Swiss-Prot record:
Pfam families in the record: DUF3243 (PF11588)
Coiled coil: none
Name of protein: Uncharacterized protein YflH
Secretion signal span: none
Amino acid sequence: MNRDQEKIQIENEMNAMHGTIKEDILKDFEEFKGYLKKQVNRGKKLGLDDGKLVKSAAILGDYLAKHEEPQNGEEMLLQELWSVADEDEKEHLAQLLVKLVDKQ
């Protein structure tokens, strides 16, 4: 699957997510980390390597930055970092987020 197809798939999943579920995930940073951890584990079970997991996390970060308002201080910080980062830095930030939830 190429990056554009992956982007469309992730955006479709986020758009299809019921509003209250998405709100619950985004209102609390611990909930967000739990959601991200589930997605990372799901990807690993499907055989995705770390590079693919990071690219997926970066696509999710792009989606959230464009379509969702931060609902807590941690999300505000992530959005501000995302807004000033170039593509390479966004990938590094996504890598750190994957590493963060993978160690929990």
